[in-house]
Amino acid sequence: FTGSRHTTNPLAISNKIFDKFIELGGIYINQHVKNLIQNEKNIELLMEDKKIKFDKIIICAGAWSNQIANMLGDKFPLDTERGYHILFETNEKLINRPVAWSESGFYLIQIHNGVRAAGTVEIAGLNKSPNKKRLNMIERQSRKVLPQLGKVQSTWMGRRPTLPDSLPIIGKSQKNNNVIYAFGH
């Protein structure tokens, strides 16, 4: 594909967006929501050591969104689609665009600090431990495609929020006009 684009440092982009949010007056609070109290005018979030009232809230907590929605009486058939990532060390540019290996269900992409292999889909909920067999398969298959890959620098597993129809939940709560949902993959 000519003219394709990708980023070599997705974290740097996320950090720039976050910094702009703060610069424009956004407030970042990193606490667990313990409960929500709702009435006709507002919603109060009860967190670990804070209470804050809002006119409206947007619930966009990814795979954890259902835990908050349940506090409001809304229930969704949300599950977790787990994807696995391996970062390989390399001192040279091995590929110049994302490369898919459809047989094994993963992509390879050159990023600023190595080559990332990521993919596969596993429906396994929020709390199950990572499946090391999937990481081993991705590493083995990646080395078949790019034998010059270096050592494994890091591995991690991500949790994508998924619904049976693969469509996201976007819109107002049917039970509370003060709540907007925005999650799903």
What are these regions (language model features)?
Residues 111-147:
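Conserved FAD/dinucleotide-binding core of flavoprotein oxidoreductases
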Residues 10, 102-103, 143-185:
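C-terminal catalytic lobe of FAD-dependent flavoproteins
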Residues 11-20, 31-34, 49, 88-109, ...:
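Flavin (primarily FAD) cofactor-binding/catalytic cores of flavoenzymes
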Residues 44-46, 116, 180-181:
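General beta-strand recognition
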Residues 25-27, 115, 179:
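Short, conserved active-site loop motifs that form the nucleotide-linked donor/cofactor pocket
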Residues 5, 105, 123-126, 179-185:
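Glycine-rich phosphate/pyrophosphate-binding beta-alpha loops
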Residues 47-96, 148:
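Central helical "cap/lid" subdomain
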Residues 1-56:
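Helical element adjacent to the flavin cofactor pocket in flavoenzyme catalytic cores
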